Amino acid sequence: MKLSAPLLVSLAAFSQAVTALVAFPGAEGFGANAIGGRNGQVYVVTNLNDSGTGSLRDAVSATDRIVVFAVGGVIKISDRIVVSKRVTILGQTAPGDGITVYGNGWSFSNADDAIVRYIRIRMGKGGSSGKDALGIAEGNRMIFDHVSVSWGRDETFSINGDASNITVQNSIIAQGLETHSCGGLMQTDGGVSLFRNLYIDNKTRNPKVKGVNEFTNNVVYNWGGGGGYIAGDSAGQSYANIIGNYFISGPSTSVTAFTRGNANFHGYVQNNYYDPDKDGQLDGFELGVSSSNYGGVAIMSSKYNYPAVAYTMSPAEAVTYVTKYAGASKVRDSVDTQLIAQVQSWGTEGGLISDEATMGGPGTLNGGTPAKDTDGDGIPDEAEKQLGTDPNTNDSMKLHSSGYTYLEVWANSLVPSTYH
């Protein structure tokens, strides 16, 4: 098989970086080597304001920053947030119930080396018309981990254009708003990894894939008539691994799991399950390896040599993991709690929505109490004592022997580093 030039470039770039420090323990896939703001400065978000000093918008407006939080709650935004290059956003550092950003979407276009963890991005019907809840049109090396994205007005989470080396893992992509109601486009030759995510309550594009893609251990629930996994539907060439996923029909589902493939979409498929009967039990079956079962794609006999997961779950294991841990799950908010309950109804609950009020909006979050941080370097005093740093000296951006900054070492310790 002749590989496309963009694919060869992408794989060469990844192979040169495999020995580099990964973004955080547990980072995988094409975007695993994003560096974020490791070589820059710390920015502590101290309020829930839309803009101004101490706000999240201000925090991501400049390059080379690691963003941590001394506040928890809902940040209501009027305009889209545009993220700069080499920014790390560590939502797990927020006290209380964490951070939800509500009211409009985010652009990560050209936000090279972004690292984003444990944050909720909820656009809503008041957001910019024709825009995604989270969109990437260009940029290289980004990883999104345990992110909950919902209520996009165009797509919910899309990656297009010249973007390359992107990973979305352990995340929830939910409830694109009607009448469009799309999970998202994943269409770049630069390489996108989708691992252990939940797509739920999107009429179509769960996701729609073109180009170079690894789709492993995801759960897709209650897609609508537009389609579940849409295989390109394009004259362009696509090369994908589709491994160990579970597709579960819900009340809105009226078409099969895979649609709109053609001879230009080359897919290596293995151990994907489909439960079409909406009977309140998880009792799906393995899809036979045939073009007809996979929407007309050209079935490949060998797996593409893309950066893969360290451990491939069975589809049943993927469902167990995703329902327990996907999204900003350090503390699950009311929205994600409802979504997981829908999945666990095994086909009897769920629906497409046009207004987030159906879900109770973003809900309320316990803001918690910020820990004492005498030197203001982002690491609480008690944690500094355990790390061996000085609570009275701004030293969180110094490098630990692991290669991460002390700030990253502390933040990484707050959440699990493995999934098996």
Curated annotation (Swiss-Prot):
Question: GO CC terms for this protein?
Answer: extracellular region
The active site consists of R205
- From the Swiss-Prot or TrEMBL record, state where the protein is found: Secreted
Q: Which InterPro entries match?
A: EF_Hand_1_Ca_BS (IPR018247), Pectin_lyas_fold (IPR012334), Pectin_lyase_fold/virulence (IPR011050), Polysaccharide_Lyase_1 (IPR052063)
The protein's required cofactor(s) are namely: Ca(2+)
Which reactions are catalysed by this chain? Eliminative cleavage of (1->4)-alpha-D-galacturonan to give oligosaccharides with 4-deoxy-alpha-D-galact-4-enuronosyl groups at their non-reducing ends
User: What GO biological process terms are annotated to this protein in UniProt?
Assistant: cell wall organization; polysaccharide catabolic process
- Superkingdom of the source? Eukaryota
Q: Where is the EF-hand domain?
A: 262-297
Task: Give the enzyme's main class according to its UniProt record, as a single word.
Answer: lyase
Which family does the record assign? Belongs to the polysaccharide lyase 1 family.
Protein name as annotated? Probable pectate lyase C
Tell me the lineage of the source organism: Eukaryota, Fungi, Dikarya, Ascomycota, Pezizomycotina
